[in-house]
Regions:
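Short loop/turn motifs that connect adjacent beta-strands in outer-membrane beta-barrel proteins
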Residues: 8-15, 49-58, 101-111, 158, ...
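C-terminal structured "cap/appendage" subdomains that terminate the fold
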Residues: 186, 190-207
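Membrane-embedded beta-strand positions of outer-membrane beta-barrel proteins
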Residues: 3, 15-17, 44, 58-60, ...
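Transmembrane beta-strands of outer-membrane beta-barrel pores
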Residues: 7, 19-23, 48, 62-68, ...
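Residues that define the transmembrane beta-barrel architecture of outer-membrane proteins
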Residues: 1, 34-40, 88-92, 143-147, ...
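Outer-membrane beta-barrel "beta-signal"
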Residues: 94, 199, 221-241
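Aromatic- and glycine-enriched pocket-lining scaffold segments that form the walls
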Residues: 1-68
Length: 241
């Protein structure tokens, strides 16, 4: 369920609120059978034109949901030993988009720059049980942030090249004294470089070649190559900004 309001101003200003029942990231788990709306989102977007060739949009958002986790905590390395109960997950961030095309016509050349920063906080009661020693339970608060920046440039009609970098911080824990000696401090900040080249033979199809240098796993570097064919069939919605 979502409600939005666009202000009657010379600039584009949109305010919105949304309620939902999330599944998966960024929430450990949510109960689909629970009453009410367990997840809430607030967002604001502001944008406008810069001359006849450029435009921009900036945004801010905040999201909150209740935790309902029955298995291991996903943010801990040895998750089989840990269970999180109760508490909330909160996520907020800032985003920015800049677009350029000669006289506003993107058919020949265009540039799109995009960036986003976000932070996630999880709190609740954590239980450590390795099956050998007595179980220990105490409050925990986890904080982690991440960001990405990317650019896509259309240098001739139908052909584009792009570059992207995304990164997560190693995060931090704030726990009770009972759990302090049982949790190892996170010491790795995953990141990834991506570059791509694509060709669009029509408005509804695209062929993309992409390479990733992926360091999202500690002590392991992955060199990944993808070849994609993307095709759209039938009616499609309005173009996004």
């Amino acid at each position: 369920m979502q409600a939005t309001w666009i202000a009657p101003l010379p600039l584009f200003l949109e305010l919105g609120v949304e309620g939902d029942d999330p599944v998966g990231f960024p929430f450990p788990e949510s109960s689909a059978s629970s009453n009410g709306i367990p997840s809430y989102t607030l967002f604001a977007r502001l944008g406008g034109d810069i001359g006849t060739s450029s435009s921009y949009r900036v945004g801010a958002w905040w999201l909150s949901s209740e935790n309902d986790l029955s298995s291991g905590a996903p943010f801990l390395d040895f998750s089989d030993f840990y269970t999180l109960q109760g508490g909330d997950t909160r996520l907020w961030g800032l985003d920015f988009i800049f677009k350029w095309a000669p006289e506003g016509n993107p058919s020949e050349r265009s540039l799109k720059l995009q960036a986003e920063w976000m932070q996630r906080r999880i709190d609740g009661n954590l239980t450590f049980d390795d099956g050998v020693n007595p179980a220990v339970t105490g409050p925990i608060k986890v904080t982690q942030d991440g960001w990405y920046v990317q650019g896509v440039y259309q240098f001739i009609p139908q052909w584009r090249g792009g570059l992207r970098y995304d990164r997560l911080s190693n995060g931090s824990y704030d726990v009770s004294s009972d759990l302090a000696g049982l949790l190892a401090a996170p010491d790795y900040a995953p990141y990834r470089w991506s570059t791509m080249l694509d060709w669009s033979p029509s408005e509804f199809s695209r062929i993309r070649l992409q390479y990733n240098y992926d360091r999202t796993q500690q002590s392991l570097a992955n060199n990944e190559v993808f070849l994609q064919y993307i095709m759209s069939l039938g009616a499609h919605g309005a173009h996004k900004f």
